[in-house]
From Swiss-Prot:
Top enzyme class: transferase
Protein name per the record: Tetraacyldisaccharide 4'-kinase
Record's keyword terms, sorted: ATP-binding, Kinase, Lipid A biosynthesis, Lipid biosynthesis, Lipid metabolism, Nucleotide-binding, Transferase
SUPFAM superfamilies linked to this entry: P-loop containing nucleoside triphosphate hydrolases
Stored InterPro entries: LpxK, P-loop_NTPase
Length: 332
């Protein structure tokens, strides 16, 4: 299914023209809904602390989670106490739920589990982001709210908007759902504070982000990084992210011999039997996001690659300046 959609959205499949009338309808609905909030006919919830939205205008993963982790570390370094809210995709959550390092992905979603495991950040997940934000402020000592996704959740007022764009795929065929990958028109990118480009090449006015591999970690936590597979070794690779080929290309660039690769749909659930059969006796390499979903049954030779986002110093300075301005405005 995912490969067919990729052909439609990114490879110029002619079927996109048949779906164009539905895209026009989708565009009209989303525009009308946005205008209801813009003119005040539908209320927006505001909060006494800055709200930063990390989202995108395309369907699928683009690098939001590494960006959220980058923001957490940047803001903490400068004395802020951020917290994160998220939808918790792929799991059914009644109301809202605080996320702790002991939670697994089946309880809170894969991205929240990964973010909290890496940073131990205060975090609340739930379908209603307003309720999640309120519980975050009620239960934790937080002075900035970061929303992992939620760019189109206009009921939540925001102070800073960041769009993460896949630098290789960019806007695909430029069409809205279902003919293309866009949730909103490309014009939306011009209305946000920053467009962050993951990979590829940033265009004028965009911020270039690089995902830098750091260290191999044992998925089950029982093995030392010193025993991780070495380059030139035969391995099996898997990825259930928005753009799996990016991970496979990274491994090839690092020198690993990919005996087999398996792309799964984003937010896929994994079973021990499926992954054991996939790997056989070879080391199984995966992303950090995949690892949080199989650490309970992982074998000793399963590894995940941690990556750190790198952004220009100028972006850091601009963001911190804007955060300071918002804090001062809210204190008046």
């Amino acid at each position: 299914m995912q490969s067919w959609v990729n052909k439609l959205w990114y490879d110029g499949h002619v079927l996109r023209f048949a779906l164009w009338p539905l895209s026009l309808l989708f565009a009209a609905i989303t525009w009308f809904r946005r205008q209801l909030y813009a003119v005040g006919l539908k209320p927006q919830a505001t909060f006494p602390v800055p709200v930063i939205i990390v989202g995108n205008i395309t369907v699928g993963g683009s690098g939001k989670t590494p960006t959220v982790i980058y923001l957490i570390e940047l803001l903490r370094k400068h004395g802020y106490k951020p917290g994160v809210i998220s939808r918790g995709y792929g799991v059914q959550i009644d109301g809202v739920r605080s996320v702790y390092p002991s939670n697994n992905a089946n309880q809170v979603g894969d991205e929240p589990a990964m973010i909290v495991a890496r940073t131990n950040i205060p975090m609340v997940v739930g379908a209603k982001r307003i309720d999640a934000a309120q519980q975050l402020l009620n239960d934790f000592d937080v002075d900035i709210i970061i929303s992992d996704d939620g760019l189109q959740h206009y009921a939540l007022a925001r102070d800073i908007e960041l769009i993460i764009l896949d630098g290789e795929r960019r806007l695909g065929n430029g069409m809205l759902l279902p003919a293309g990958p866009l949730r909103e028109g490309g014009w939306r990118a011009a209305a946000v504070d920053h467009v962050i480009v993951n990979g590829g090449e940033a265009q004028s006015g965009e911020q270039q982000m690089l995902l830098q591999p750091t260290l191999w970690h044992s998925v089950n936590g029982k093995q030392s990084p010193d025993t991780a597979p070495e380059p030139e070794q035969d391995v099996v690779a898997m990825a259930g992210i928005g753009n799996p080929s990016r991970f496979f290309d990274t491994l090839a660039d690092m020198g690993y011999r990919l005996d087999k690769v398996q792309a799964f749909d984003d937010h896929s659930a994994y079973s021990e039997a499926t992954l054991t059969a996939l790997a056989g006796e070879l080391p199984l390499l995966m992303t950090e996001k995949d690892a949080v979903k199989c650490r309970e049954f992982a074998k000793d030779n399963w590894w995940y690659l941690a990556v750190d986002a790198k952004l220009p110093h100028s972006f850091d300075q601009q963001l911190l300046t804007r955060v300071k301005q918002v804090v001062e405005e809210k204190q008046r």
